[in-house]
A protein has these predicted regions:
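Conserved ATP-binding subdomain of kinase catalytic cores across diverse folds
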Residues: 15-18, 22-105, 110-213, 219, ...
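Long, low-complexity segments enriched in small/aliphatic residues
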Residues: 193-263
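Positively charged, low-complexity intrinsically disordered regions
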Residues: 4-7, 345
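General secondary-structure propensity
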Residues: 7-17
């Protein structure tokens, strides 16, 4: 469990505390959690069976989709890691923490970073998944990112030394970016973003052709691409193209359709007035259920097709209405202050992202009371294929992910306290490398346990 930290009466995190006081307070927290202590990972004797943790999550999901989730997790240790955020959250809660909290992503593996367009149509790089976001220790996000880099590197066949270099570079980048952030103003931190020019400068020259290809692909992954891939023309109407079980229409007699329509109207009220005015120009033309991601498979998710009147053939947007379940961090970090998991996701995203989706909002199921958040399905979104990167490329890519994570933590935590705690040496970097190697072995064992559970018929998996 998280170790609480009692701060002095003159709270060094308050606006009254000086920069030096906050930095020294961060340094003092090394007595609570020595920096070298972050290297430790040993499963405790009462550690829950990871399959039980996954099955507990499955209880709240659509039963017919749960086998798809397990099928995707079976593919590799990395896909298992992506789908087992609840297992790693349970494990991280037993590890040392300094007591400094941030708005944590909660699932900061390397595939939850990527490129997307801001409302101003600039392409930026940032965290792009917030289903598990919650105020929590910064260590949990950094460790999940670095473990994922280790797992990917070993799957790519890189040596132990090259893998350690990849992970250490990410940990060092995180530390150095926070050190730099500690001398920035609040406004400078708020306005900072990682744009295309930053990415071009950070990556090695050998990777630039692939980066440009990825950027071009991201720009093409917009509403037009979503329409071409997911819809078809029936007479004069645009409709989603059924692709069961991944994309299916609801039965006209299903009351869920009425629920989705009511949720869209409720969602409308969560938008700022200017965005609501834009949204009101569109009308619903179709609704379907969609399977998304790995860890999210089985949560309720619909895509809603809207058409506007502004040009011949219609102007379309596709919104995703996705269930927001309890964060995997909540049992260990405490409940959200919002009291609504859809709002929790939206607030966390707005706090940590440099720029958020134009149509980001929330709603609630009228009959079930389930919480949802809403965003555009595709709006110039791109992700680099880490499984095709060589060691140098993965090293640089991991460092950009760590930069984005440090920027998010600096915005929502106290960068000066964090910088004071982390210090100017590689002590934390080396500890994170050691932890990542140890936990990657644990992840491989847990993945093997899932393979065995499927083989024994304990859980059902569907590979599509």
């Amino acid at each position: 469990m998280i170790r609480s930290v009692q701060t002095p009466h003159d709270d060094p995190s308050s606006a009254r505390a000086t920069w030096e006081e906050r930095r020294e307070f961060g340094r003092s927290l090394r007595k609570v959690a020595p920096r070298s202590s972050h290297a430790a990972w040993t499963p405790w004797s009462g550690r829950r069976d990871p399959i039980d943790v996954l099955e507990e999550q499955a209880d709240s999901r659509e039963p017919d989709l749960v086998p798809i989730r397990y099928g995707r997790m079976l593919e590799s240790p990395f896909t298992y890691l992506r789908g087992s955020a609840a297992v790693m959250a349970m494990d991280l809660a037993t590890t040392p923490v300094s007591g400094i909290r941030v708005q944590a992503c909660g699932d900061a593996h390397v595939n939850n970073f990527g490129k997307f367009a801001t409302p101003e149509r600039n392409v930026v790089f940032d965290i792009n998944d917030f289903d598990e976001t919650l105020p929590a220790p910064w260590e949990w996000d950094l460790k999940r990112l670095c473990v994922s880099l280790h797992v990917v590197a070993r799957m790519r066949g890189f040596s132990r030394s090259r893998t350690a270099t990849i992970v250490e570079t990410a940990a060092r980048t995180y530390r150095e970016r926070l050190r730099r952030a500690s001398t920035s103003t609040a406004l400078e931190l708020w306005y900072e973003r990682i744009d295309v020019d930053h990415m071009r400068r950070e990556f090695p020259e050998s990777y630039l052709p692939r980066l440009e290809k990825d950027l071009a692909k991201a720009r093409r992954k917009d509403h037009s691409r979503a329409l071409a891939r997911l819809t078809e023309q029936l007479a004069s109407t645009t409709r989603f193209r059924d692709d069961p079980p991944l994309l299916v229409h609801l039965d006209d007699t299903d009351s869920t359709m009425d629920d989705v329509l009511a949720m869209v109207e409720q969602y409308r009220l969560s938008l700022a007035e200017d965005r609501r005015d834009l949204f009101d120009r569109f009308r619903i033309v179709d609704v379907a259920r969609k399977v998304v991601g790995v860890g999210s498979v089985g949560t309720r998710c619909w895509v809603v097709l809207f058409e506007g009147p502004d040009r011949p053939g219609g102007d379309h947007i596709v919104l995703q209405v996705k269930e927001a379940q309890r964060s995997v961090l909540e049992p260990y970090a405490g409940p959200p202050t919002q009291g609504h998991d859809g709002i929790r996701v939206v607030v966390g995203q707005r706090l940590t992202q440099a720029a958020s989706d134009l149509f980001l909002g929330w709603c609630e199921g009228p009959r079930t009371g389930r919480h949802y958040y809403v965003r555009q399905l595709w709006d110039v979104k791109g992700q680099s294929d880490v499984m095709r990167m060589n060691a140098a490329e993965l090293r640089y890519y991991g460092s950009v992910c760590a930069w984005a994570l440090a920027r998010a933590h600096a915005r929502t935590g106290d960068a000066t306290q964090l910088a004071g705690y982390l210090g100017g040496t590689a002590r934390v970097d080396r500890a994170i490398v050691e932890f990542s190697a140890a936990y990657a072995r644990q992840n491989a064992e847990d993945h093997a346990a899932l393979v065995d559970a499927v083989a024994a018929g304990r859980v059902q998996a569907a590979v599509l």
